[in-house]
Amino acid sequence: MADAEDIEPLVCDNGTGMVKAGFAGDDAPRAVFPSIVGRPRHTGVMVGMGQKDAYVGDEAQSKRGILTLKYPIEHGIVSNWDDMEKIWHHTFYNELRVSPDEHPVLLTEAPLNPKANREKMTQIMFETFNVPAMYVAIQAVLSLYASGRTTGIVLDSGDGVSHTVPIYEGYALPHAILRLDLAGRDLTDCLMKILTERGYSFTTSAEREIVRDMKEKLAYVALDYEQELETAKSSSAVEKSYELPDGQVITIGAERFRCPEVLFQPSLVGMEAAGIHETTYNSIMKCDVDIRKDLYGNIVLSGGTTMFPGIADRMSKEITALAPSSMKIKVVAPPERKYSVWIGGSILASLSTFQQMWITKGEYDESGPSIVHRKCF
């Protein structure tokens, strides 16, 4: 690591739904692809076709009709390490086209990630990919960096999991972190269910991707759910049409806001959990009374599931209703919040003050995987 100046660190944000990867110092990830590994459902009969036993990311996505798709990350936490290794391999060699043994690698993890998981990540990086140095950072903390703050509460909601993470002067407060197993994938499932009730059939993993696209293009959060339902009944103002890959056209109306409403009312899908607004409030209430004012004034949204139009206004309205009446409440929804975890990682890994924080290969060889708990907190 003597000539560290000219070697850019790699930043890889492994999400449940998408992998975001690129070089530290860039303002956006170079590679963004789905966290999927697909294996053929049928055996190949065409000789010389060069069929692979596994496809990763976009290639798996484009051949989804003949593959069984698996997501190695569930609810933000890696559950299948062999597939995860395939994804990392694809990231380094095919997407970024770099040799990982020449670059330090910054990985991200979900808050409250099990200790064994961080160790396994560390072990794979050093032993399989031979990286010279690595670091594991908490996703929500990186989002806060990206918004230019060191204090605030981050609501990070991706495809697999949502978290509220209060951060004071750069330190996450672990006792007040709350996790909600309700995120983008559940909303996609919910929309699939609503559409199935209407007589459309969406069941396979490939069809789920169509519904996800429909959700991303058409769904929004209502400021007042009940009132919006009334409007939808009486007029066709909320109706929009969507063309399926086979040319069929679906018209969706109230479904557009019924689906993201689940974030605020998990009971709609039979979940006994508090909505994202209440979880955020509960998280703030678990913090010291002296810092709550700073948290209420810096509620930062991050992750793809916070991209719905109307979510920031609704969040602001709901939290204002829960908080003390004199409290000043500010919900920040940065336009780049889909990638703010990655951007925060890019900022962190390129800071000169961060360079002594890396776990080096030497330190790993000396202490083993448990070093990650001492150096990354």
From Swiss-Prot:
There are at least 13 actin genes in potato. GO terms for cellular component: actin cytoskeleton; cytoplasm. It catalyses: ATP + H2O = ADP + phosphate + H(+). It comes from Solanum tuberosum (Potato). It comes from the Eukaryota. One of its GO terms (molecular function) is ATP binding. InterPro entries: Actin, Actin/actin-like_CS, Actin_CS, ATPase_NBD. It is an enzyme of class 3 (hydrolase). Belongs to the actin family. It is found in: Cytoplasm, Cytoskeleton. The lineage of its organism: Eukaryota, Viridiplantae, Streptophyta, Embryophyta, Tracheophyta. SMART domains: ACTIN. This is Actin-101. Actins are highly conserved proteins that are involved in various types of cell motility and are ubiquitously expressed in all eukaryotic cells. Essential component of cell cytoskeleton; plays an important role in cytoplasmic streaming, cell shape determination, cell division, organelle movement and extension growth. Its EC number is 3.6.4.-. Its main location: cytoplasm. Keywords: ATP-binding, Cytoplasm, Cytoskeleton, Hydrolase, Nucleotide-binding.
